[in-house]
């Protein structure tokens, strides 16, 4: 009789143990599901905040007067950093970059594109890389340079801020171009640095005025590659709420007819997973 009671007690204890394990597993699964749902909802809120901020930043782009593009330079309001906060505590930071001030990856398809690329790499004091011979390069992203064996992550991080892809119509904006990109055009680096440092606050009104600067006479610069304005810009936005952070990068083209902005490409990613900026 006592043996039967002992077996019954063991059975009850076994059932209770299994029940507790089952409940513990369900609670753990619920916590994981709740945490994942919280992350998902937080990410959705940050994503929407970024898209709303994108609309706000688009309104900051240079405006055309009477459907005519004007001078674009880095001291205008669009080029200043932006920061604001939302009622839910989300903090947003944004900046706009003139892509016409960068090395155009579309040049790599030109006969002189490789020489320009090599001069840019030299001006940035990077390890020289060998571009594939006899092959038309159609890079659209700086990250495609990773296909080259000499390119490392630090190399790419240094290279990326100076390059972008634009259509063939994209010209270098002499009012926003940094010295290394000027050097890629065949301008000695010391002269390029002086041009960058001594640029007038209001920008150059014409390419001819820029070409009249000391040191540029006699250099084989192609007028069709130069401009004092731009139609291509990059918006970079960061949203932060607590430990959650998202980054949005948007490339924008202004229509040739009236300057109306059109989104070309858009990236959204968590900052922790972020590769070198596009």
Give residue ranges: language-model regions.
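Compositionally biased linear targeting/interaction segments
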Residues: 2-278
């Amino acid at each position: 009789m006592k043996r039967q009671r002992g077996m019954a007690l063991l059975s009850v204890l076994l059932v209770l143990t299994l029940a507790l394990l089952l409940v513990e597993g369900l609670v753990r699964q619920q916590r994981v599901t709740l945490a994942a749902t919280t992350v998902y909802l937080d990410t959705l809120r940050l994503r929407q905040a970024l898209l709303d901020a994108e609309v706000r930043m688009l309104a900051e782009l240079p405006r055309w007067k009477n459907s005519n593009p004007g001078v674009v330079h880095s001291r205008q309001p669009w080029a200043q950093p932006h920061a604001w906060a939302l009622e839910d505590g989300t903090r947003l930071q944004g900046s706009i970059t003139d892509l016409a001030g960068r090395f155009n990856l579309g040049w790599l398809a030109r006969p002189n594109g490789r020489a320009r690329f090599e001069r840019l790499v030299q001006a940035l004091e990077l390890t020289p890389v060998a571009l594939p011979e006899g092959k038309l390069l159609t890079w659209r992203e700086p990250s495609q340079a990773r296909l080259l064996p000499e390119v490392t992550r630090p190399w790419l991080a240094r290279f990326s801020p100076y390059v972008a892809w634009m259509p063939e119509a994209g010209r270098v904006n002499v009012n926003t171009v940094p010295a290394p990109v000027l050097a890629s055009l065949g301008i000695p680096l010391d002269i390029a640095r002086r041009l960058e440092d001594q640029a007038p606050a209001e920008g150059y009104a014409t390419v001819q005025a820029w070409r009249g600067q000391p040191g540029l006479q006699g250099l084989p610069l192609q007028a069709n590659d130069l401009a004092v304005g731009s139609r291509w810009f990059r918006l970079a936005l960061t949203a932060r709420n607590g430990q959650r952070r998202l980054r949005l990068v948007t490339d924008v083209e202004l229509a040739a007819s009236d300057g109306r902005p059109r989104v070309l490409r858009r990236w959204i990613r968590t900052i922790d997973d972020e590769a070198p900026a596009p």
